[in-house]
Amino acid sequence: MTDLEVSAIQVIDENKVFNSLLVDYMKQFYSQNNSSDDKGLNYHIVSVFGSQSTGKSTLLNHLFHTKFDVMDESQRQQTTKGIWLAHANHISSSNESGDFANNTKNVFVMDVEGTDGRERGEDQDFERKAALFALSTSEILIINIWEHQVGLYQGANLGLLRTVFEVNLSLFAKNKQRCLLLFVIRDHVGNTSLESLSDVLTLDLQNIWSQLNKPQGTEGFELDDFFDLKFVALAHKLLQPDKFIEDISVLGDKFISEDQLFNEGYHRAIPIDGWSMYAEQVWEQIETNQDLDLPTQQILVARFRCDEISSQVYESFHEQFVKSNWDDLSFTEIGNSLKELRQNAVQQYDILAGRYSESVYLQRKKLLVQKVDLSILEVYTSVLQKLIRQSRDLYLKQIESSLTKKEAGIIFYQVLDNAERESLKYFNENTSLISFVDVDDSEARSYDPSPKLRELEEELSNLRTELVNKEQENIKTKIPRKFKSHFKLIVQDELSNIKPSSWEELLDQFRQVSEKLLAKYKSPDSNYDFHLGLSKEKNKELHEQVLIKFWIKFKEILNDFVTETNVLRLLVSKFEDEFRYDEEGLPVVWKNSAEIDVKFAKARNSALDLLPLFSLAHTAEGEILPDYDIAHDEAEAESDNEEDDGFKESHKFAHLLSARDQDAIRNKFKKQTDALYVETKRSVINSKTEVPLYIYALLLVLGWNEFMIILRNPLLITLLLIGLTGLYLGYKTKLLGPIVQVVQAMIQELQDQAKNKLRDVLVSEPEAPSQVRIGKEVDATKDED
């Protein structure tokens, strides 16, 4: 039997000190035999007590193959001191395979110091405390008595049992915690049947129960409400050794059986890893003579163990959590990793802590989940923020891509709608990948992506508003700019040849260009929709703002074109056209000065008649007025470029030239036209100067020979006839003046070139000697040096 015996550990020594190594002892044997047990409840505690030297330790050693110290029969003295505990690896059995069976139920047995020992004498304090400890921690309480002690009060430990009953009633009255009292009657020789002995003991126990001082509220409780009684008889160990072993085996079969002795109602429901702490706290309460509240002790153990388990689980979770490089993982990998980490932590806690008090277990579980979620939420929130950024970037990228394609019929607000739909779809699809908790999980409300979705929707809404406003400004800038580029040419062409009907024609052209540029925004109901998703009122407001910009651009074009310089140039051009050319567009050949005076006066008056047309833009109905008040908008535009000089009245649309401007133009026009008049007058006077008659006679006398040579020479006469014919044609076509001017210009050019050539020759000739002389002087200077 020695190879099957297991060493014991002292739980409480004779000095009433609890052994802190008990927890390691119990875990050691429990883990060896219950590696697959998750709850830690597959164990049983069996205690034995009785009078000293009655063979309690011997009984346990034979029954459970333990190694408790036994009494030396040569010396009658105390052997078991304090309370000892041992794991029963094997239990005696009568089965055919051997004389023992494996301890699959993890039975731990406690050997309690015997009562009525001479070592303690009258001091019964430890006896009562030990009995109370055994009752508080054990499922089965073995009471070891001799057959001849049945019927005795002290010998059968009935006095101690009375104390046990009273304490049990005070401890377990609320929850009616049950316990099995197993009376093992030793040295039964068979003269008195076991049934008779059982009846005697049962009657004694009931008498003791009836005489108890029951606490208030427990008067109606009976012995059967708290204790189950069973009786076993064992033969004499020395006189009937074989029978004794047989009876031990039969008793062992009862412990092995599923329904003979053990009952779920006896179990204290303390997991094995918390039993040592529970036992220590119970003993501390007993030792300090405090009221022992076992349910409270169980709660305290549950709290301690659940906190300990929670810390261990969180440390394991955190170790795995910090190892993960979340930035390098995809959304699917992040979701799976977070889900696995969270589920593993919760499941591990459920396995280890679910064995304790449900209220404590759930409370600590909630705290653990909150702590785990704090870490996970950092990653979860970070991922959601990353998703928001990516969704926003996708939104802008979709818009840019659609607008860049410039497809026909593209509508701006539809582009925004499509981009928003794709952005939200991207966000929702990826949030579903990282959603790793059920929506019914009350602890998972922090993982609801709805707040972040609303944040994204709000951000997209703000972006949409910003883009729509930007597009409105773009429309108010781009379309008026295009209007200006088109209408500017029309204004230049029309005002360059201004006439009384020009302003009416320009106004018609203004409306035509405006309608043409806005035609694509016009809806069938004659309203305007700029495809920005705006309301009817907003579209109307934008349309008016664009038209205001058109009028402002109209005003800018007029201001740029109708300036003193341009108007003066146009008036002078008009004057020259009428003064230099006739109605057929041919250059005028002046015959006399009177003709110049008439033509000059007519041309100048005709040109000056155009000045009022430039000064005021008006039609037959009156001056042109914008359809909208552009004073405020125009003033804002001008304030960025120039300061108000006190004379500018920007709100007067039709007033282009002030009286001062007109006077300045008239004065400059008068000076330029007067200069032209004088030049023309001088050229006519020069061409009309008369040659004296004697000059002709003198030419005839002196040039008679030359004249005759020409007449006699056919070539010369031919050239003369051609020259005369050309002069005649020039005279008839009134081109003699231009011909003379061209000839004079040619002669002048020939003279200039001749002078330049002569100057070059005269200047270049003396240069060579001077250079030689200078060179010699330089050489002479060098020689002197």
Curated annotation (Swiss-Prot):
Its EC number is 3.6.5.-. It is a multi-pass membrane protein. Its main location: endoplasmic reticulum. Residues 40-266 form the GB1/RHD3-type G domain. Signal peptide: none annotated. GO terms for molecular function: GTP binding; GTPase activity. Residues 712-714 are lumenal. The chain crosses the membrane at residues 691-711, 715-735. The keyword Secreted does not apply. PROSITE patterns: G_GB1_RHD3. Residues 451-479 form a coiled coil. GTP binds at residues 50-57. Cooperates with the reticulon proteins and tubule-shaping DP1 family proteins to generate and maintain the structure of the tubular endoplasmic reticulum network. Has GTPase activity, which is required for its function in ER organization. This is Protein SEY1. The gene is SEY1.
